[in-house]
């Protein structure tokens, strides 16, 4: 399959303005894709070479290298390329422009050998990109530059443009997983009605390329039988939230398992033979940060082929007490991880089992999963089952909640133990409900919102971005709906970081997956997630989240708390959750005694 075809689709995808068109064009691309390479094409359109969970390096070639490679490929001086870059501001366009100018020479002689421009094959491109990503050690910089220069030398202008953006890590077509799943269902199932089958398979085996390969080469029927596979992450099950224990017990039909809600890092742990791999909440491979945990798991969890889930929590080695989750940050260091492991010891608190020795446990009710988990865990002081009780009265739940908090937990997770209490991979539902200690403020909880636009500041901050247009995620439509403009809570350092982040992601037009009536100074590709707290949720004509007759919902007095790099935009707070928070808040106001309202 020719790479040229893909580059042309990239160009068309970038210009599209609606989500529906995006899906249909993507489906068109899949129809024209040779089935053997569809997995690679899926990775490429998402700007990567492989799924994050592989832990394999992505390219991320810096500007300087690219300038060198472009100059080398097209016979320009580096200063010329730099100058052009200053004028245009996009190295992809620079490559496009310089490649277009190489006209005097016939394409054949320019390209060299007997390969014509436009003849690049997808696998050839992919393999060369893999070489660039994986070459390390002395001299590797020069090798990378040479390989890339060779590649764009053979490319057409449009191929060169997208290759440059790809290796720079700026191919931001903003095609989320949901759009790919829709397009796969339409292309290979025949209609969007097949989406649930494709989605279920993806939830259990979160490798989009692999799912595309199975459906394209073996058909939709094959997807129905997919089960979790150690080594490939499962999309995590998520909890709903409620601030009131009474309501929670009602939702649970009067009886539930109540776990401590530990404040650490979620870990999905896979064992396949001798190999133990740990995936984060975002399904990134974090094994290297927790080599100690992999050893504990090998030692204390019986079996050779399983997937379990738990929370990694820093502990005081002397007292065994829980420590603040910030201590885990030290484990992110690239160097001296061994020291961080020694200095900041952790324990693992397991709360679920999804797969054991060939058997899919995700379809079994929670009591069965937990019983097996207890059975396979040997007694030890590093890996524990999450502290829990079975509560059948509201006061029991309340009491346990306070106990959890007093021991340093963040609250409790209340979990259904009914016959339908399966592990709902990849979805947020009422089978798990979180009750957290910070449900005291007016707006019950913080929200995680996606940056979709930015505004320049005035006065002291003139010329710099100082506020952000934020959106919630609407999973049904797979779009981002605006809910507030955040201008406070940033430290000076965070403001500086913000300039960099926005400059990398800004775009001229609104992204097709963004629904907004407000027009910011610059639009931003929906990629960054920030945690935000506000005073309350109100109806507003300005915002598009949950828009009804009276307007949309908006967060008043929003304040930035921190970036949530561990979340992808599709993990942001949903429109549905904002609606639920709003209804809760209304109910609270109605329930207040009259005199308090005066
Ligand atoms: N016993 C437990 N059962 C399930 N999850 C737990 C448990 N203890 C701690 N957790 C953690 O709680 C998280 C969910 O709650 P929280 O809202 O604090 O996190 P979040 O990442 O902001 O939200 P979410 O994961 O629901 O999107 C889980 O992702 C998991 O890491």
Curated annotation (Swiss-Prot):
CDD domains: Adenylation_DNA_ligase_Arch_LigB (cd07901), OBF_DNA_ligase_I (cd07969). It is an enzyme of class 6 (ligase). SUPFAM superfamilies: ATP-dependent DNA ligase DNA-binding domain (SSF117018), DNA ligase/mRNA capping enzyme, catalytic domain (SSF56091), Nucleic acid-binding proteins (SSF50249). The active site is at 261 (n6-amp-lysine intermediate). Its cofactor is Mg(2+). It catalyses: ATP + (deoxyribonucleotide)n-3'-hydroxyl + 5'-phospho-(deoxyribonucleotide)m = (deoxyribonucleotide)n+m + AMP + diphosphate. Keywords: ATP-binding, Cell cycle, Cell division, DNA damage, DNA recombination, DNA repair, DNA replication, Ligase, Magnesium, Metal-binding, Nucleotide-binding. Pfam families: DNA_ligase_A_C, DNA_ligase_A_M, DNA_ligase_A_N. Its EC number is 6.5.1.1. The keyword NAD does not apply. ATP binds at residues 259, 266, 281, 311, 351, 428, 434. PANTHER family: DNA LIGASE 1 (PTHR45674:SF4), DNA LIGASE 1/3 FAMILY MEMBER (PTHR45674). DNA ligase that seals nicks in double-stranded DNA during DNA replication, DNA recombination and DNA repair. Belongs to the ATP-dependent DNA ligase family. This is DNA ligase.
């Amino acid at each position: 399959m020719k790479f040229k075809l893909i580059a042309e689709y990239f160009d068309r995808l970038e210009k599209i303005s609606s989500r529906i068109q995006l899906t249909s064009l993507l489906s068109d691309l899949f129809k024209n894709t040779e089935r053997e390479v569809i997995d690679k094409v899926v990775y490429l359109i998402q700007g990567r070479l492989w799924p994050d969970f592989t832990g394999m390096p992505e390219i991320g070639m810096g500007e300087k290298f690219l300038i060198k490679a472009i100059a080398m490929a097209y016979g320009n001086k580096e200063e010329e390329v730099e100058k052009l870059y200053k004028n245009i501001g996009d190295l992809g366009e620079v490559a496009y422009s310089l490649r277009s100018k190489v006209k005097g020479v016939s394409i054949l002689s320019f390209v060299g050998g007997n390969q014509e421009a436009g003849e690049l094959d997808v696998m050839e491109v992919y393999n060369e990109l893999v070489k660039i990503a994986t070459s390390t050690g002395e001299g590797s910089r020069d090798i990378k530059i040479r390989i890339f220069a060779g590649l764009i030398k053979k490319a057409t202008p449009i191929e060169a443009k997208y290759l440059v953006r790809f290796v720079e890590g700026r191919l931001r077509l903003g095609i989320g997983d949901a759009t790919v799943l829709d397009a796969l269902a339409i292309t290979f199932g025949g209609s969007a009605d097949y989406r649930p089958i494709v989605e279920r398979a993806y939830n259990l085996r979160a490798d989009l390329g692999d799912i595309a390969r199975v459906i394209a080469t073996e058909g939709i029927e094959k997807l129905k039988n997919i089960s979790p596979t150690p080594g490939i992450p499962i999309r995590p099950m998520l909890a709903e939230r409620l601030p009131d224990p009474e309501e929670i017990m009602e939702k649970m039909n009067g009886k539930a398992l109540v776990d401590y809600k530990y404040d650490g890092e979620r870990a999905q742990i896979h064992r396949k033979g001798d190999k133990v791999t740990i995936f984060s909440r975002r399904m990134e491979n974090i094994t290297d940060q927790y080599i100690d945990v992999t050893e504990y798991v090998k030692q204390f969890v019986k079996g050779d082929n399983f997937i379990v889930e738990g929370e990694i929590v820093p502990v005081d080695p002397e007292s065994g007490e829980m420590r603040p989750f910030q201590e885990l940050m030290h484990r992110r260091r690239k160097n001296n991880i061994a020291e961080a492991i020694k200095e900041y010891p952790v324990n693992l608190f397991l709360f679920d089992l999804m797969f054991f020795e060939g058997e899919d446990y995700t379809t079994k009710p929670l009591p069965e999963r937990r019983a097996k988990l207890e059975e396979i865990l040997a007694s030890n002081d590093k890996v524990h089952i999450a502290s829990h009780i079975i509560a059948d009265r509201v006061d029991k739940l309340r009491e346990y909640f306070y106990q959890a908090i007093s021991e340093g937990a963040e609250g409790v997770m209340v979990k259904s133990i009914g016959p339908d209490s399966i592990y709902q991979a990849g979805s947020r539902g009422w089978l798990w409900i979180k009750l957290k200690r910070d449900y005291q403020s007016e707006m019950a909880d913080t929200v995680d919102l996606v940056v979709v636009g930015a505004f320049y500041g005035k006065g002291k901050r003139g010329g710099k971005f100082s506020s952000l247009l934020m959106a919630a995620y609407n999973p049904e439509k797979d779009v981002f709906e605006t809910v507030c403009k955040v201008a406070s809570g940033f430290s000076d350092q965070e403001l500086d970081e913000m300039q960099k982040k926005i400059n990398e992601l800004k775009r001229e037009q609104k992204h097709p997956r963004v629904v907004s009536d407000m027009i910011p100074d610059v639009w931003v590709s929906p990629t960054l997630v920030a945690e935000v707290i506000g005073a309350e949720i109100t109806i507003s004509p300005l915002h598009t989240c949950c828009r009804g007759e009276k307007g949309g919902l908006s967060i008043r007095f929003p304040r930035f708390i921190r970036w949530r790099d561990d979340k992808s935009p599709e993990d942001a707070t949903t429109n549905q959750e904002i609606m639920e928070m709003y209804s809760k808040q209304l109910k609270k106001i109605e329930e207040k005694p009259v005199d308090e309202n005066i």
